[in-house]
Amino acid sequence: MASYNTTTANAMFKINYYKPSERLYNTADPLSGRLVNKNDFTGRSRNLPTYKSYSGGVGSGSKPVGNVASYEEAVLLRKKIYGTCEVDREAIKASENSAGAFVKATKEQVMKTVESYNRNKLRIILGNGGHATAARDSLLGNGNGSTQVSGAGTSGNPYVVVCGVDFKEASFEEKDFINYDAEVSLLEVTEVDAATKTIKLVGTSTGLASLSGSGPVPTTKYFYMQGSKGNDPFGFKAISDLVNGQTLYGVTVDRKWKMQVNDALGQGIIVDALNELLLQIEKKTGKVPNMIQCSYTQYVKVLNLLEDQKQYNLPAKDSRFKASVSFSGVEFMSTKGPIPLFYNRFVEEDRIYAFNDNYIEIHHAPGFGWFDDDGTIFMRKSNGDDAYEATYGGYWNMYAQPTFHGCIKNLAI
């Protein structure tokens, strides 16, 4: 005779549902919240005069000849940056009370879409002007091309792309939809392996199909967030890579309109290198950066380097006090006092950035946020689906005066 147990009498036992687990992804953003946001960007463009030299002739012994300063005009154009979510109407109705679901479908999607948008915004601010990553034929220590492609893009045989040395794990999340080069077809990220710098993709791609099993991704080909090729604002990776003669916001890059970039040539980070970077920026502008951001890799090295300057802010468990506790980090002592140093998952492994957030502005058109012009944020989809769609975001661009910021690149990893 069988005993009465959870198997033989399965229908009589309830399922004990507990609260959802903590999110298993990193949403920390120690940069965006410190930037200046302006929500009055109307008109076709925003033009900002730049002063690149002194004005007025000076001299002794006789009256000097006057001169006019060197002026240029920075031109800022808005970019369309979106986050969207879709919710099936049945799911909305099925989640209207706690007996039907852990959370309301609309509330869950609203929260997760804002999280995803903020992640993409941070990627843009620190990015290279569009690329999700340069999965390309980068050179490794052995001098051979690193990127290889295999697979067929199906769920059972996904494209497997081994990325180059500038791979950033944070650029990809499972379930992301991305484009390869200029293709409009969507590729779903199904797996990310940071250790091997490998991503797996499911979807249709003529370009990847032609490369599968035959060779690396060309140096001119990249992956992009959906529709982002040529449409992202310039980020700090792109700004730091500019050379004299190129332009940023329409202003010619030269010694007065250029980020201070020091090449470590494969050496490890040392205090002298940080001091040199900060003093070079102060020498040019009279201002010292007020924030340093680096990759996790460099942060580990900095923790060992600044053993006597470590300072941690441990957040209180009690929510009543959390607002009074700042983001945890390390302080680096500059000529103008301590500067907070944070790790940022969107910084390249071999880089450290020094920012002055007083000279980084996000210029928004009015009405940034959820698109609710029709009185509601959830609109019925027009393609016949029994579903609703909501859009978050707006029209903005970042204006960073490059001379007030700096970077150390090619640090030992």
Task: Annotate each PLM feature.
Residues 49-71:
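N-terminal low-complexity, intrinsically disordered segments
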